Design a protein with these regions (language model features):
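Face-selective signature of the C-terminal outer-membrane beta-barrel domain
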Residues: 242-260, 275-366
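Outer-membrane beta-barrel domain signature
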Residues: 74, 130, 174-176, 225-230, ...
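Predominantly transmembrane beta-strands of Gram-negative outer membrane beta-barrel pores used
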Residues: 114, 142-153, 159-167, 174-222, ...
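Structural signature of outer-membrane beta-barrel domains
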Residues: 60, 110, 120-122, 167, ...
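Residues that define the transmembrane beta-barrel architecture of outer-membrane proteins
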Residues: 81, 156-158, 181-185, 233-235, ...
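Outer-membrane beta-barrel architecture
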Residues: 85, 104, 161-163, 177, ...
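Periplasm-facing N-terminal accessory domains of Gram-negative outer-membrane beta-barrel systems
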Residues: 1-52, 95
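Periplasmic N-terminal accessory/gating domains of Gram-negative outer-membrane beta-barrel systems
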Residues: 26, 37-39, 59-150, 161, ...
Length: 366
């Protein structure tokens, strides 16, 4: 043991042998015969000769996977689980705050991420105000995220691609759940349409923020004051169908529909209304010949509609609508158990429309 000044005290019967050692120094032994005589111990440097060291490393692939188990491990924001919140916990992906559903991959913008289901792009990943994403993990809980090294079949986005695989449902029995959150509630169910053959999974979510806001606005005594609460409501429905026609054929379908509405009353004479609707749907089939090759073709559609109206001293309004039709076909052949080649094609037609509100000549487009 040592005292407060760092001096060691050792107890032993004389004569005794003391050993002194330290990292990078040679061990020294000293035989103590007389405790009254001081002595000095000098440790000599020890040289460790190492053989050549080769350090190797492999580049980390810019691809990761998400699962239902991983999503359930993160805290629920406003009582809702979210696949994008889970992705924000992985390396290279962040979000600005807990109420922002967007993700930022390696410093890029959130609008530079492509969201797909079965390799088909969807209309919009989040609701109007950005509180929550449109993805319900009850159905959309497995995905492949490409942060770099994008496959050649993807284009148009710079940061990442999130390809989600909808839950096929349960072909044996029915199961479901009802969730109650701080801002919304949902009814979820999955089960067989044809037992052992065709299954489905469906989720319907609605908010009650607008009800709280309406009750508050009715309680405002002075309707001329600008202290009204915005009345915001969102709804979404997600449906997935999976059917195994035979050992060679498999058919799937997916649909996602959202409705958002925001009403802001500044005073008794001025009111703003915004509406936002989106729809994404696709259906496709896989054919697997006896040699293990895969033929996959898919048809999809996506659309988004927004409309705004302002009632007051200067009424104005407008809206826009865009939609796309996409068709894809791909053939995959594997050989030597390690290599595969893909060949395919893609067709897409898109249209964007915008217009003023037709009932007033002085309206300006917003």
């Amino acid at each position: 043991s040592s005292d407060s000044t760092g001096y060691f005290e050792l107890a032993c019967e004389v004569p005794c042998t003391l050993e002194f050692s330290h990292v990078n120094y040679k061990k020294e032994s000293y035989t103590l015969k007389d405790t009254r005589s001081p002595f000095i111990v000098i440790l000599r440097n020890k040289f460790n000769n190492l053989r050549e060291v080769v350090v190797t490393g492999r580049s980390t692939p810019g691809r990761l996977y998400s699962s239902k188990e991983g999503i359930e491990m993160i805290p629920a924001i406003l009582g809702e689980q979210d696949i994008l919140k889970y992705l924000a916990t992985t390396p290279g992906i962040i979000t600005t705050n807990a109420l922002d559903p967007g993700i930022y991959v390696r410093g890029s913008n959130s609008c530079e991420n492509g969201f797909l289901t079965h390799d088909m792009e969807i209309a919009s990943p989040d609701h109007l105000t950005g509180i929550l994403s449109t993805f319900d993990p009850f159905i959309l809980n497995n995905s492949t995220v490409y942060k770099s090294g994008f496959p050649a079949v993807y284009n148009s986005y710079l940061s990442s691609y999130i390809n989600m695989r909808p839950d096929p449902g349960n072909k044996q029995k029915y199961e479901g759940e009802i969730t109650l959150g701080l801002v919304s509630s949902a009814l979820k169910i999955k089960g067989p349409l044809v037992r052992d053959h065709t299954s489905f999974a469906a989720s319907f979510r609605t908010s009650y923020l607008q009800t709280i806001a309406r009750l508050y606005n009715k309680s405002v005594k002075d309707q001329k004051q600008q202290n009204f609460m915005p009345e915001y409501a969102f709804n979404d429905a997600t449906v997935s169908i999976d059917s195994k026609l035979s050992n060679r054929w498999r058919v799937t379908a997916f649909g996602l529909f959202t409705i958002d509405g925001l009403s802001m009353k500044l005073n008794e004479n001025v009111n703003y209304d915004f509406n936002w609707h989106t729809f994404s749907g696709n259906a496709g089939a896989w054919y697997t010949p006896a040699n293990g090759d895969i033929l996959h073709f898919r048809l999809g559609v996506k659309s988004a509609f927004s409309e705004g109206d302002a009632e007051g001293t200067i009424p104005m309004g407008g809206g826009n609508r865009n939609y796309s039709i996409i068709a894809r076909i791909m053939y995959t052949h594997s050989f030597l158990d390690k290599f595969q080649w893909n060949i395919g094609g893609k067709f897409e037609q898109a249209r964007f429309e915008t217009a003023n509100r037709p009932d007033a000549e002085e309206n300006i487009l917003i």
